[in-house]
Amino acid sequence: MTPSFLLHLRLADPSDVTSLYDIRQAAIRQLSLTHLSECEATAWAERGGIPRVERAIAKDELWVATFGLQLVGWLHRAANSIEGLYVSPPAARQGVGTALVRLAESHIAQTGHPLVVLESSLNAVGFYLRLGYAPAGTQCSSAAVPMSKHLEAAKHVGRSPLR
């Protein structure tokens, strides 16, 4: 997929639910197979369905990325945690995930949190390492790696960037 439109980021709304669920399913089933068996990917894809997405939308915790009118990715953030990041396979490696993570980091920094935490799927560890995240804590699951990143901007919340 070569985007013919600029990437646009916005809060998700209830009309997005089905598309977001479909993106999650496709991303897990197609992009995680480099590190998971098909059975493991299917089990993961079937957890946390539509009700979880609806709750995140209701709390304004879910952002979407679009190329034109097409939803191509989404990120769920709660407090200082990235709870999930999914990009449509045709839009993978085109900056969608990076843009969503940067947006989440900005919002987290604005709330004064100095640290972003997440659990990365095995296939996404390299992506998060490139964005400055580091393994953190004890890995309790064979399919998830705890990671974190310190945010310098959080130290300057409320200050003018020119000071």
Task: Briefly describe each language-model feature range.
Residues 25-51:
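Conserved GNAT-fold acetyl-CoA-binding loop/helix
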Residues 5, 112-125, 131-163:
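C-terminal "cap" of GNAT-fold acetyltransferases
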Residues 8-22:
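A short beta-loop-alpha structural element at the N-terminal edge
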Residues 73-80:
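A conserved beta-strand-loop-helix scaffold within acyl/acetyltransferase catalytic domains
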Residues 59-73:
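Conserved beta-hairpin
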Residues 91, 95-103:
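Conserved acetyl-CoA pyrophosphate-binding loop and the N-cap/start of the following alpha-helix
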